[in-house]
């Protein structure tokens, strides 16, 4: 029986770039989840009634409870069926694929991505559309609007879902199908990549060593299935591959600061190729012995070698794209290959219109997200398999190419090297972060600064506040990041991030292109030292925030 339960609105239920993310303690408030899920049901197109949805998450604390609430409210709103992974597990890329493969109405994904998990940490809920992609602003703003005036929600009291084994079960009016969360995704990867070629490469090069670190996020079982079962590598290549509700007390963010377990193993054992993924499986880091691959370089190198991957060789490449703060390395690939390169705001949803219009095939973000039009989310394990396929393909052409360093050098010899670094200042006071942005805005908004040297050697060539005009639907996204380009080929960008659950996170991005091959092997921080100095001077960062060092350097 459908029950209508009275409720009151909560402030601040505004979904960000990747859904609603808050502390678990916020989600635990009475009716907090119920309100947001009801608001989500109200925007399901064409209607929640009769809808088929996928529901699952990265296994973080509060995941199971949230699934129970979603099932009850889904039943109350006439949803016909939900598909859930065993134990409630489902990586974000796998969820996107399942929506598309089974032509579902949409999906509710439970994750706070790379943010820490546990009773005192973060949780998140996001809605994906029938194309498998994250809900765009037009939809998330509708959800937010409903949460501000909500007065009731509809539910059916159903017994706790049994998510321990696969199978189809009825709970009142709701059908619940529990599936293997890994199976469909593994099948998709086998259709995209040349697994025979990778296996051949591994057998011919016994000195090639590999390690995959899931950081106790959701991709552990996916990594074990692909790298061990399918590609035949020993189980020892997978570490931290058991999903844990608090990610083992760590921060499931694949970067040099938080993926210390991977970095330590690669450095200790001189591993040729190491890779890590994040909490929900949509990010990846590629890190080998003496060879960290920046995300900006990674997507550019994948774009350059796309024809080595069967999916692109057979289906063609429509175009490339990057988020605005991502380095211009992929722009050079696009120019060389005669492909359009789109510059979009941060947030994967901005790529999805381009995918659906067949304008785009490969894209990436500097925040360790790479992906393609095979699904409508970024995809960490896909990115790792790209590198294995590219290494195997290049090695088949030239047996001397067998390391990440070899691939990087080959790329730099064609395009030059775009040195790149990101400084994150986390949990700043909002006022201090605002003052730093004001310093940047003073230059970005002042057109008279063009042609002026703001510091010796740093003459402004262009500056502004990035705005995006979607070429498909005509929508506009303004205030997407402040940038200054200089005549010496360098660029700095600042953004306030919207994905943290407390405090402000200021992100500072710096890059400089180098065509002198004698400098390609420089450490990025050494090569960028003048740019970093200029950025910190322009922004008065230490003076305004009191921070001598960033929280994270990438």
From Swiss-Prot:
Family: Belongs to the phosphohexose mutase family.
Domain of life where this protein originates: Eukaryota
GO cellular component: cytosol; nucleus
The keyword Nucleotidyltransferase appears for this protein: no
UniProt function note: Catalyzes the reversible isomerization of alpha-D-glucose 1-phosphate to alpha-D-glucose 6-phosphate. The mechanism proceeds via the intermediate compound alpha-D-glucose 1,6-bisphosphate. Key enzyme in hexose metabolism. The reverse reaction is an essential step for biosynthesis because glucose 1-phosphate is the starting point for the synthesis of UDP-glucose, which acts as a precursor for the synthesis of oligosaccharides and trehalose.
Record's keyword terms, sorted: Carbohydrate metabolism, Cytoplasm, Glucose metabolism, Isomerase, Magnesium, Metal-binding, Nucleus, Phosphoprotein
Cofactor info, note text: Binds 1 Mg(2+) ion per subunit.
A GO molecular-function annotation: phosphoglucomutase activity
Native source species: Schizosaccharomyces pombe (strain 972 / ATCC 24843) (Fission yeast)
Pfam name, any one: PGM_PMM_II
Residue(s) carrying Phosphothreonine: 111
High-level lineage: Eukaryota, Fungi, Dikarya, Ascomycota, Taphrinomycotina
Active site: 113
Entry cofactors: Mg(2+)
GO biological-process terms attached to the record: carbohydrate metabolic process; galactose catabolic process; glucose 6-phosphate metabolic process; glucose metabolic process; trehalose biosynthetic process; UDP-alpha-D-glucose metabolic process
Oligomeric and partner information: Monomer.
PANTHER family: PHOSPHOGLUCOMUTASE (PTHR22573:SF2), PHOSPHOHEXOMUTASE FAMILY MEMBER (PTHR22573)
Name this polypeptide is given: Phosphoglucomutase
Catalytic activity annotation: alpha-D-glucose 1-phosphate = alpha-D-glucose 6-phosphate; O-phospho-L-seryl-[protein] + alpha-D-glucose 1-phosphate = alpha-D-glucose 1,6-bisphosphate + L-seryl-[protein]; alpha-D-glucose 1,6-bisphosphate + L-seryl-[protein] = O-phospho-L-seryl-[protein] + alpha-D-glucose 6-phosphate
Residues annotated for Mg(2+) binding in this entry: 113, 278, 280, 282
Stored InterPro entries: A-D-PHexomutase_a/b/a-I, A-D-PHexomutase_a/b/a-I/II/III, A-D-PHexomutase_a/b/a-II, A-D-PHexomutase_a/b/a-III, A-D-PHexomutase_C_sf, Alpha-D-phosphohexomutase_SF, PGM
Residues bearing PTM Phosphoserine: 113
């Amino acid at each position: 029986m459908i029950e209508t339960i009275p409720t009151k609105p909560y402030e601040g239920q505004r979904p960000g770039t990747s859904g609603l993310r808050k502390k678990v303690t916020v989600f635990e408030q009475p009716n907090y989840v119920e309100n947001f899920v009801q608001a989500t049901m109200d925007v399901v197109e064409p209607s929640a009634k009769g809808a088929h949805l996928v529901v699952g998450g990265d296994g973080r604390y509060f995941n199971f409870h949230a699934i129970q609430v979603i099932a009850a409210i889904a039943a109350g709103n006439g949803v016909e069926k939900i598909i859930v992974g065993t134990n409630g597990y489902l990586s974000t890329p796998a969820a996107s694929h399942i929506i598309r493969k089974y032509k579902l109405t949409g999906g509710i994904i439970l994750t706070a991505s790379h943010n820490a998990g546990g009773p005192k940490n973060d949780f998140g809920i996001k809605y994906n559309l029938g194309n498998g992609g994250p809900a765009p602003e037009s939809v998330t703003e509708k959800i937010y609007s409903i949460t501000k005036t909500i007065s009731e929600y509809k539910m059916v009291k159903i017994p706790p879902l049994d998510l321990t084994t696969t199978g189809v079960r009825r709970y009142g009016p709701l059908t619940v199908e529990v599936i293997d969360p890994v199976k469909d995704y593994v099948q998709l990867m086998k259709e995209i990549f040349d697994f025979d070629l990778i296996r051949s490469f591994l057998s011919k090069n016994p000195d090639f060593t590999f390690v995959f670190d899931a950081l106790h996020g959701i991709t552990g079982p996916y990594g074990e299935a692909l790298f061990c079962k399918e590609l035949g590598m020993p189980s020892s290549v997978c570490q931290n591959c058991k999903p844990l509700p608090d990610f083992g007390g760590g921060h499931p963010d694949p970067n040099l600061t938080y993926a210390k377990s991977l970095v330590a193993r690669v450095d200790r054992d001189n591993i040729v190729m190491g890779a890590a993924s994040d909490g929900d499986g949509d990010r990846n880091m590629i890190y080998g012995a003496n060879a960290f691959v920046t995300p900006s370089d990674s997507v550019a190198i994948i774009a350059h070698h796309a024809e080595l991957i069967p999916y692109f060789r057979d289906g063609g490449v429509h175009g490339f794209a990057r988020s605005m703060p991502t380095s211009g390395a992929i722009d050079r690939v696009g120019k060389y290959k005669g492909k359009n390169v789109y510059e979009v705001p941060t947030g994967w949803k901005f790529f999805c219109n381009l995918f659906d219009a067949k304008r785009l095939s490969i894209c990436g973000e500097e925040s360790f997200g790479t992906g393609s039009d095979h699904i409508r989310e970024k995809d960490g394990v896909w990115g790792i398999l790209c590198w294995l396929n590219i290494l195997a393909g290049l090695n088949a052409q030239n047996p001397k190419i067998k390391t990440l360093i070899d691939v990087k050098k080959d790329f730099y010899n064609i395009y030059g090297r775009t040195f790149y670094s990101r400084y994150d200042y986390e949990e700043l006071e909002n006022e201090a972060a605002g003052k730093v942005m004001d310093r940047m805005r003073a230059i970005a908004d002042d057109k008279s600064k063009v042609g002026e040297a703001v510091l010796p050697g740093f003459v402004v060539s262009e500056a502004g506040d990035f705005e995006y005009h979607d070429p498909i639907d005509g929508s506009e996204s303004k205030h997407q990041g402040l940038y200054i380009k200089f005549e010496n080929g360098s660029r700095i960008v600042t953004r306030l991030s919207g994905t943290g659950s407390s405090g402000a996170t200021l992100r500072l991005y710096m890059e400089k292109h180098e065509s002198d091959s004698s400098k390609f092997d420089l450490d990025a921080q050494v090569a960028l030292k003048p740019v970093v100095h200029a950025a910190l001077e322009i922004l008065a960062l230490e003076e305004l925030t009191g921070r001598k060092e960033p929280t994270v350097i990438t």
